[in-house]
Amino acid sequence: MGIFNNIVFLIQKYGILFLTGTGYTLLLSLITVFFGSILGSVLAVLKNNRFLIVRSISTAYIEIVRGTPILLQLYIFKFMLPEAIPGFKPSTFVCILVALILNSAAYVSEVIRSGIEAVDKGQTEVARSLGLSKRQTMFKIVLPQAVRYILPALGNEFIMMIKETSLASVFFVGDLMTQFQTISGATFLTMEPLIIIGIIYFVLTFSLSKGVAVLERRMKAGER
């Protein structure tokens, strides 16, 4: 059979596995970016804390995570997390998810920090001169405007995470590349399932990138 016929055969026989892999990939990415955004917001606040020790710890965490390969982090959490808490034996999926969340948080914190810094400093000064506290200024003036810079960047982080979850296949967590290993082992085909999975990844990331571009244009239009 030719490559095209093999692709048709794989879709017909293993379509459910490709769909399952897509579901797991999206699930991993969504949960990672959601909780990564929450933790990243906390890190961004801590990095601007007035206490040096707090700033130093958050900065060190961000730099260490961003300065080490994500695959290394996945390995560390896969083998460390079950041993770290006595009596708690998380599944491989949970271990990998925690590692991805902590990785994403470091990058999201910088996204949020950049979004906040993009807001005109003059507005902060005006708000403080009108009697608003630093906290009130941040939540009532700065953050509502920073959102238009942050949201598109978070969309790009989600797209990036879809691709990075492919590394989780090393631990067989059900994502697209895990399904590739299953299908390839059952059929002894390599190129054809990779082509199908490549198309799925492209469709996901391309459609999402277009959505992010539309969101970014609308955010910019709202500035006028």
Description of each model-found segment:
Residues 1-224:
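Transmembrane alpha-helices and adjacent helix-loop boundaries
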